[in-house]
Amino acid sequence: MFRTMMKSKIHRATVTHADLHYVGSVTVDQDLMDAADLLEGEQVCIVDIDNGARLETYVIAGERGTGVIGINGAAAHLVKPGDLVILIAYGVMNEQEVKEYSPRVVFVDADNKQIELGSDPAHAPEGSGLITPRMLSTLEASRESSLV
């Protein structure tokens, strides 16, 4: 059996530009592509944190060190400059590959510079203000006890 697994994620990147008059794709800083193990032409899902839009496209390499996250083509109707997005790539793996593979999870700052690289898809960096799904039962318990 084959499974579709998350292989890479660039988390909470800021869209630097959106250009409707382009053939399509997302332009990503080559440094971020390397960190996330993304290849030019690879399919990615883009999730817009600000408006909930989800779309699929492919990656085009952007200039290293620029922090570029550029939305190109029709997707510019859905994702705007300044929006926070998550770029996710999936891979189809057999059972053995699933056991051996670790995803690449890249966290970036407001300028799209890498601040953390890990492999836990549910990790929330300290000080990020994000909540990991693995903490939900602990959070619910603390909320309930504060209501008593």
Curated annotation (Swiss-Prot):
The EC number(s) this enzyme carries: 4.1.1.11
Cofactor dependency: pyruvate
One of the protein's GO biological processes: alanine biosynthetic process
Keywords: Autocatalytic cleavage, Cytoplasm, Decarboxylase, Lyase, Pantothenate biosynthesis, Pyruvate, Schiff base, Zymogen
Reactions listed under catalytic activity: L-aspartate + H(+) = beta-alanine + CO2
GO MF terms held by the record: aspartate 1-decarboxylase activity
Subcellular location: Cytoplasm
Keyword Cell division: no
Pfam families referenced in this protein's UniProt entry, alphabetically: Asp_decarbox
InterPro entries per the UniProt record, alphabetical: Asp_de-COase-like_dom_sf (IPR009010), Asp_decarbox (IPR003190)
Cofactor notes: Binds 1 pyruvoyl group covalently per subunit.
Residue(s) carrying Pyruvic acid (Ser): S25
Disulfide bonds: none
Annotated binding of substrate, by residue: T57, G73, A74, A75
Cellular component terms per the entry's GO annotation: cytosol
Pathway note: Cofactor biosynthesis; (R)-pantothenate biosynthesis; beta-alanine from L-aspartate: step 1/1
Modifications the protein undergoes after translation, according to the UniProt entry: Is synthesized initially as an inactive proenzyme, which is activated by self-cleavage at a specific serine bond to produce a beta-subunit with a hydroxyl group at its C-terminus and an alpha-subunit with a pyruvoyl group at its N-terminus.
Active site location: S25 (schiff-base intermediate with substrate), Y58 (proton donor)
This protein's record includes keyword Translocase: no
Chain's role: Catalyzes the pyruvoyl-dependent decarboxylation of aspartate to produce beta-alanine.
Quaternary structure (record): Heterooctamer of four alpha and four beta subunits.
NCBIfam families xref list: panD (TIGR00223)
Family statement: Belongs to the PanD family.
Annotated HAMAP family: PanD (MF_00446)
Name of the protein: Aspartate 1-decarboxylase
